[in-house]
């Protein structure tokens, strides 16, 4: 703990996170049975891609071979995805930024870890898709396909009608249907 603030420094936060992740793996593996070999999902640092790719974040050691996966979230740029300060996406810089950020996670796939993007999405405002939403999703999912990541679309209670059991917006439903693997 930083002596002058009573809070953990960034380095200390990474150390504590790594210790918790190692304790998680050790605890699960020690219980025996199927837990000796089950897949375990390790949350990245703050579930943020850049922070998770920082050299201070270390995947735990594991007695099981190739059974650890790392999970992050992707809401970049936040002004577009989860806030209202950006209303469109799709210029050259947007594509480059998304591509560069997602490529960072190859640090883990190159080491044999699976990557799960446990949340991603673009907030829908006033029942209208933001300009470039389908382009954003297309490029994002193309990157996931390229690198072998498993993406999970997150619903902020305005995309999926739980009572009807379907996506509310026909263009988004058609988009995902067109990407389905049969």
Regions found by a protein language model. Give the residues of each.
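Alpha-helix N-cap and loop-to-helix initiation/capping positions
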Residues: 8-19, 92-96, 128-135
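Active-site region of glycoside hydrolase catalytic domains
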Residues: 1-86, 103-122, 146
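Short, acidic/polar
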Residues: 97-105, 134-141
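Aromatic-rich peripheral "rim/lid" segments of glycoside hydrolase catalytic domains that contact
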Residues: 62, 127-182
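Acidic-and-aromatic substrate-binding clefts and catalytic sites of carbohydrate-active enzymes
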Residues: 2, 46-52, 95-96, 123-134, ...
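Alpha-helix initiation/capping motif
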Residues: 48-50, 91, 122-123, 169, ...
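Short, surface-exposed, polar/charged, turn-prone segments marking secondary-structure boundaries
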Residues: 69-72, 97-99, 143-146, 180-181
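Gly/Pro-rich active-site loop or hairpin
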Residues: 84-98
